[in-house]
C-alpha cells in the first residue's frame, strides 16, 4: 500500500481555494474550449498516476453512494441474497428518497482501504470523483463539492486551472 494521504491537508487547501475554483469552473462553463474533454482526460490520468485511492479511501469512509436498482441487484446477486434481505441489511432511504448505506464508513471497505466488492461496486463508486466524465463543465457544483472530500478532485481542478 502507498504512503497515506493527509486528507485534512487537502480539505483545508480545497476550502481556501474554493472561491478561486468556483470562478475557474464558472468561466469554463461559460466558454468551454473545444478540446475540454481531451484536456480533462489527460489531467485525470496525470492525477491518478500521482494519487493512489487506496492510500486515502476518504470517499468510502465519508460519502455513501446513491444506490440504483441495477447496483442493488448486482451486489445482492454477488452475495447470493434476495433483494429485500440485502436492502434490509445494508440500505436505508434518505431524505431525498435515495437508497444509501445505513451507516458509514462503507461496510464493504476493508481495513486495508480495499473494496471487498470492487468488481461489482455501485456505479457511483466506479465513477467517483467524476473527473474523467465528458462535458465536465456541466457538473461544476459536484466537482467543487468533491474537492472537499477527494484529494484527486482537488488536484484535478488545480491542474485544470493551470492548463487553461
List each model region and its residues.
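Short loop/turn segments that flank or connect secondary-structure elements
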Residues: 1-164
Amino acid at each position: 500500500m502507498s504512503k497515506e494521504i493527509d486528507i485534512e491537508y487537502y480539505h483545508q487547501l480545497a476550502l481556501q481555494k474554493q472561491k478561486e475554483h468556483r470562478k475557474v469552473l464558472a468561466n469554463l462553463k461559460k466558454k468551454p474550449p473545444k478540446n475540454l474533454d481531451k484536456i480533462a482526460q489527460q489531467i485525470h490520468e496525470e492525477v491518478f498516476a500521482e494519487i493512489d485511492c487506496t492510500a486515502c479511501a476518504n470517499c468510502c469512509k465519508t460519502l455513501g453512494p446513491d444506490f440504483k436498482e441495477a447496483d442493488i441487484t448486482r451486489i445482492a446477486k454477488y452475495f447470493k441474497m434476495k433483494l429485500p434481505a440485502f436492502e434490509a441489511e445494508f440500505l436505508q432511504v434518505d431524505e431525498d428518497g435515495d437508497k444509501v448505506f445505513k451507516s458509514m464508513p462503507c461496510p464493504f471497505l476493508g481495513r486495508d482501504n480495499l473494496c471487498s466488492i470492487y468488481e461489482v461496486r455501485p456505479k457511483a463508486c466506479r465513477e467517483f470523483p467524476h473527473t474523467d466524465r465528458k462535458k465536465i463543465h456541466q457538473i461544476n457544483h459536484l466537482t467543487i463539492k468533491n474537492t472537499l472530500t477527494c484529494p484527486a478532485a482537488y488536484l484535478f481542478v488545480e491542474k485544470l486551472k493551470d492548463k487553461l
